[in-house]
Amino acid sequence: MFGIEFLPQAISEDMECLKAMIQGARENLGQEVDFVLIPSNPINKASVSSLLGAYALRERFSMSVDSGFSSVVEFVPTISGAGLDRLQIQSQILGVKYGGFSSVALIGGDNGELDGVKLIALAREILGGEVSLVSGSGLKIWEKEIEQRLIQKLQAGVDRIITQPIFSIESAKKCVEHFYVLQERLGIQAQLSLGVFGIFSAESAYRINETHLGFEIPRSYLKALEQGGVKETFISLWQDMQGLAREYDISLYLSTPKHNDLRAYGNGLC
């Protein structure tokens, strides 16, 4: 299950951009896109409603006879607890069911009534087993605090975990192996998607580290970007991650700091 992130901005332009991303993934990354995740107000900046964006794009693709993708690409909306009370969150969960979505991504609010674990439990209570629940996790799941949080999400009923972006194949392998240990220990069959981040300048990478988004781009990766090996650095990371995904039968999830950045899909890559 290969997934990508897409931020809706203007429906007509979005259609063309998304088609280019899907085609680029197929031709340049060797991946068929299985699902497109629509984020909700990333980095606390207002964006098109995730539910509405996912619904509109899904309907447009289903009506586009020349797209070639409508029968295989799933659109996944995101519900974020940030700034919402319980009633508002329940309303959005009901919207997922009403809209006929088969998956939804869930993000707990830092200051909201429901954290990620409680949000998963509430969604499972309302949606039953009809909808697949997706949530995120820190990369270092072998560390006690992150591991405990992940266990709580797994026990609450999450179906797929997407990790924060990974920049080291060694860290990725350690994460996968520990995830399988947790699966066996808990008797839970949730799926894992490793986060891959398409970043194409050292300046952008430094800004991300300064913003403290919950993950850090390592010095070794920054150094490679500084030395001008932007294309080579990304391709090397992608190939390593793709090989690991095949070896362990897991999935990848591709996003970029500048949303909808076609360079990550081989279109005009540096």
Question: For the regions a protein language model found, what residue spans apply to each?
Answer:
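Active-site pocket-lining/capping segments in soluble small-molecule metabolic enzymes
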Residues: 6-24, 28, 105-141, 184-247, ...
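Catalytic domains of carbohydrate-active enzymes, especially glycoside hydrolases
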Residues: 22-39, 153-158
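Metabolite-binding pocket within alpha/beta catalytic cores that recognizes anionic/polar moieties
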Residues: 35-38, 44-89
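Catalytic beta/alpha-barrel core
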Residues: 35-47, 80, 102-111, 136, ...
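Conserved, mostly hydrophobic/aromatic
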Residues: 36, 96, 153, 157, ...
